[in-house]
Every structure is written in structure tokens, then in C-alpha cells.
């Protein structure tokens, strides 16, 4: 593709975001156990990065090696740059863990016991634990012509054991593989009386390396090293050929664990000839091998903060508030009848959203409920309420997105449970993921002595997921505005039925009007700037990649429009380039909570148009998904969105990172007054 305007590389941008996440682990202002958690989050993010983005790059290189990336690099050059940066990031991650975080944890009485530090009593306890709890579950595989190298599961923990001697059949033993079943605990607590520390732990890998000889009796163990293979986890479902998406997906899910290898992780002391064998068996190159000083899966350390009762080493707990208009109302419908309600999570509770649905399930006046589900978790009170509504005779329709990445199995299970109680379940539109967050409740009310149907709607920027609603920043709107409700009704009709494109009056919807409306709104600011009027665009999102939107923003900058972008993750736009984007700033907020809301602000000659949305400015959101953006019209709520969603981020000088024109980020230096967006909102709303 020819690049008219400069773009930054997507994969490098994703790694840049993870560098900012990892920087939280180095921040002494962050509580110690939370610093460990940020290291684990970085590992989890990198796993998905390799499963999806790096796997995609490898496939493109194989299929079309001469192609260019959207930013104009050759695929191979881009891949080499990404690998180099990923290797540096992983090295920094493990260095931070071993040189900073683990020593600090030890000072606080939280210790990971290595086998070479065990005394006799600890050794005996560890031996008994291995023999009683681990050995019965483990299956050693000796490698010979009758036992080929196993195809290890995606991201599973494995041990390669170098052996010497002959087995019971007289075969020369050379190498064995032991796969650790996912059911085995990766972290085991040592009894405090034995440990000598308030919280002593032993890693599964430590048990294995010390006692693996029990699995290969009468053989000499020369070495035992852990390794992990990351595989391509994209599911392939031919949506043009299938007749039942759920059945097709159920057939494809098991293959996810056995896709092509994209990364090999090995412990740093693994012998070179063993590494070569693992690479050969995985069909990987040396550059795809990541040698790590410690556990090959740091994600499993995520449980440590939950196992350690040390509130002083964690973020202070908070109680999300409930708006007085809700707390003082007899029921949720009464509160919404009094006017639109804006909820700002996690500072304001997600509970009113659940209560709206729970009350609707029991209310005899409610005749129908329609709901979209993208991610909701395995244990969801929201889904329980939908099933209760169906059992109570309500007309319940749920649009379940089966292709929500890594939540496919959960959503299949929910779809089955919903159908079992009589709910109508549809899977959206083939070829377009349904990412919109919508709830529609139809209620029979009496107005002026006459029975009529009244609609109530909840629209959000984030998922209907109670757990992540305490971890992600999102806005939600509850309204009975009949224009918005009518639009939501039409979108649901479109998702569940078959028909032509609908005319919506208030909502912007992808893949139809969302992208054109964004471009039109930016161009209106350009026209105002050229006419000598004040012009401004402020947008907050997770990612900015779509080339035509970026081109429009460049043109806006050249016309004199002030553009402030708050992009948490990857941003392909280059800010601050003279003659191109000197009027554009890009910042990323990384803190306790995951910044997740999407906000579009256009000055509009003083009218100040504000839209909330589930959509980032990416190709997939604007063209290959069903998304909605909804306006905030009520003046007080609009001021809140601007103040709480945009202004606090633009003023943040503690957790903000400013993007430079070369794509790198630097922390915004604190001024005389320290301003932290998330801490300020916690202080304002929470107790």
C-alpha cells in the first residue's frame, strides 16, 4: 500500500504500550504487590501479542514476503524490529522482577524458596508434596522412534529432561519430556513454620527440577529445564460456508491449542543443543527463542497478591458510589423517568446496571428485554437476570458474540444456557462482530389513563462484565429518550432480522454511518478553523490506526485545528511534526485502572458535540464490527463527560505519557501541583 501520510508501526506501538505498563512495576509510588501484578499483566499482554499479532506477521511473511506493512516497511524488516524490541522488553521484565521486586518482597516476608536453599525439613516436606500431589498426575514421555516429540499445548508448562543410562527395555535414554497439566498449582505455599517467612512459596518448576528423577527411575538426570511454546491462536471459521456458527466454532476451539508455533521460551541455562532441538521440533528460528531468567510463565504469579493478606502492599480498597438520583428512587425505572443518568465506572458502581436488569426480570410491566453480550465472564449475575426474565415469561433476546477472542467458549456456554430457558439467542451478523454495548427494555406503562409501551435503554463504552467494571474506566448512559430508544430498537431489529440499511437519527453505527460521521465532524472543524473560528477535536480511545481518520486529523492540524488525542494503546499517527501535525498532541494514561472509555469531542462552533462509543478508531471497529456511538445531549452530563473523561486526562502530570513524533513516549513531568486523573476521580466519587 502506498502511504500518503506517515504512519507508525502497529506492532511496535503495542510493545510500546507494554513498556509503559511495565514502567508501573518500577514506580516506587505503586504498592509492592501491585508492582508484581503489573509485571504479570505485561506477560499476559505479551502472550496475546504473540498469539495474534506476531502469528499474523509470520503468516504474512510466509504467504506474501514481498508485501509492505501499512507504515511502509517490508514485512521481514518490521518483523526483525519487533523481535528485537520484544526481546529487550522481556529482558527488562525479568531483570526488574529479580533485581527489584523479588528482593523487596523478601524484605516484606514474602519469599520464593529455591531448591538449593532448602534445609533438611524443607527438603522432606517438598519431597512428600511431590510424591503425594504431583507425581501421580505427571506423565513422562521418553523420546525415541516409538515416542516422537509431543505436540505440546499452547502456553503449557513443559520440562525437557536430558538423561543418561538404559531403561528397563535396554533402550539408551537421551531425552524426556514432562508436560505439567494445567490442573496442577504453579505456586505452592510452604507451611509458615517450615518457611521461616510469613509467606513462603515454592514454584512448580522448583519441585520439578529437584525431583524429576523420580519420573525416570535408575536413569541419570543430566539437566532439567522448563520451556513453553506459544502458538497461533486465531480461529479459522469460514463464515461463507458454515450453516451453524456455534457448531462450527465448537469444532474449531480445540485446534487453538495446537496451532503453528510462534515463540519458544526457555530457561536461560538450557544447554544450547537442547534449545536447537526444541527450535527444530517447533519449526522456529533462533530469533523466536526467548531465554528467561526464571519461570517461563510469569502470568501464574498473578495469584500471589490474592494469596498474601497485606493490604499495605496493595492499592487501597474503595467503595464505588451510587448516584443519589438512583439511591433515592423507588426503582430504577423511576430514576430513569426523571432524566438521563450517566455512570462513570469504576468510580461509580456497576450495580445499578445489574439492578435495572434484575428489576426488569421481575417487573410484571416489562414485556421484552434485548441485550448484547461480548464479554461477561463465567459467573455473571447479569446473565442470571436474563435467564430469570425468560423464566418469568419475558420476551428475552440476546445477541451473543461467539467470536469474542478468548471468550468464545464462555459465550457458547451462555448461549446454550439462555436457549435452555427459552430466550432467543442470535449470533449477530456473519462477518461483523457485534461489539456494541446495548440493553433495551420494553415496559407497558399507563400515561394519561392510556396503556402504552415505553422503552428504556442502557448504552455503554465497556462490557457487561461486573468484574472488569471495577478495573476498567467506562461510561454508561441510562435513558428513556425515545429517539435514542427508537434507534437502539432498529439496531436490534437489524441484528436479529434481515433487511436493508436503516436510518438512525441519534446513533452513529458501524459499519454504516460511524466512519463517515467521524470524518464529517473533523472536516467541520477544519471548515471552522479556516473561517477563523475556534476549532478543536479531543478524542479518547484505546487505539488509533484507521488511515483515513488519521489523514483527516493531519489535515485538521494543518488547517489550525487543535487536536488532543488520549490513546491508551497503539497510535499510528505521528504528532508534533512541523507542517504536518504540530497542532496534535497524543498522550497515554497508564495507572491503577485500565483506561477503556471512548469519547469523541468536537467543538462544533461552540455547540460542543460529545459522543460516547464502544469503538476505537481502527479498521476493524469502523468497517468490520457492529458498533454504536451515542450522543450526550443533556448539558450537565455533557460537562461531566468533558471534565471527568477528557480534561482530567489532559491535565494529568503523574500517569500521563506524551508521545513524541518518532513514536516513543516520555513521562509528562510533574509541575508544582500534582494531578493524577484516576486518583482525583477516586477521591471525588469513592469512599
Curated annotation (Swiss-Prot):
HAMAP family given in the database record: Polyphosphate_kinase
Gene3D superfamilies xref list: Endonuclease Chain A, Polyphosphate kinase middle domain, Polyphosphate kinase N-terminal domain
Family stated for the protein in its record: Belongs to the polyphosphate kinase 1 (PPK1) family.
Essential cofactor(s): Mg(2+)
Record protein name field: Polyphosphate kinase
Single annotated GO MF: metal ion binding
Protein species of origin: Burkholderia ambifaria (strain ATCC BAA-244 / DSM 16087 / CCUG 44356 / LMG 19182 / AMMD) (Burkholderia cepacia (strain AMMD))
GO biological process entries: polyphosphate biosynthetic process
Annotated active site: 435
Known EC number: 2.7.4.1
GO cellular component: polyphosphate kinase complex
Source domain of life: Bacteria
Catalytic activity: [phosphate](n) + ATP = [phosphate](n+1) + ADP
Post-translational note: An intermediate of this reaction is the autophosphorylated ppk in which a phosphate is covalently linked to a histidine residue through a N-P bond.
Residues noted as binding ATP in the record, renumbered to the chain: 45, 472, 568, 596
Gene behind the chain: ppk
Enzyme class: transferase
Pfam families found in the cross-reference section: PP_kinase, PP_kinase_C, PP_kinase_C_1, PP_kinase_N
Taxonomic lineage of the native organism: Bacteria, Pseudomonadati, Pseudomonadota, Betaproteobacteria, Burkholderiales
PANTHER family in alphabetical order: POLYPHOSPHATE KINASE (PTHR30218:SF0)
Residues bound to Mg(2+): 375, 405
Keywords annotated in UniProt: ATP-binding, Kinase, Magnesium, Metal-binding, Nucleotide-binding, Phosphoprotein, Transferase
